[in-house]
């Protein structure tokens, strides 16, 4: 069986939940992805019959960023069934999840329990490898761009709670943040999202497995 690379974890969710709604049409997609020679191909989703809704565009961004940052094996290609979103360069099946945190003024709260369930539901599925046609456990690419840092910590906590008997399943979760803005110069870099002392302690426990 082909093996996946070691799972990737982001330092913190990007906290850009207020910008997800901007990414609904091709012209709204950052040039980093829109101008890539395979971006158009990655937006050809069999589940949407040629339509390109914002969800499909964002999934293509996630997959391409995972490839360009070396988090999955290149080249990625769009899934050819409605059950997965893309394959990595060795044909391994991936599903993309792009959870959304509430923005200022929203009257709903992030449901870490529910999002964890949707991720685990995919992790318990199998799908044929694109090249070998051997059934393989589905991996999940978790795009944390549109999440608050504290919501990602809560989601990780729920995933660990729900997998006490089989933590190894979480090795098939790969985290990524897409780049919605061009890289800033050193003297123009925005301040990173700061975590509270409690959040930092929880993150440390998650990283050390304690």
Where are these regions (language model features)?
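Catalytic toxin/effector domains delivered as secreted proteins or via bacterial secretion systems
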Residues: 4-209
